[in-house]
């Protein structure tokens, strides 16, 4: 596989990642009907909407209260998931921005320094996703 094909595959992987919105709030809210779930709350902070679910988990006669915090942007894209057990602090489990940055940084390693190739690659990226790539493609040149 040549470098160009490898780059296109990486770009397509990033676009596919961007297209997936993640688990949606309405899917999570139905969990309240399960006996383990004790609380579900939602709130807004700046441009993010948070959905917080609390449930109990029993393992070998030890019960823990687990709280999951899902953060969404206004386009209903899941941005991050954090978890806390009992009274501990939240620990990030998943972060869209960090994953996307890692994928793009991996792409940059393979990008040629040739402006013509970069311009050709830019034409292959759908318009909706050009903002995701634009600053990184400038850096590569």
Show which residues each predicted segment covers.
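Long terminal segments
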Residues: 1-39, 93-141
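A short, polar/proline- and glycine-enriched secondary-structure boundary/capping micro-motif
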Residues: 62-65, 89-98
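Short, solvent-exposed aromatic-acidic interface loops
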Residues: 82-90
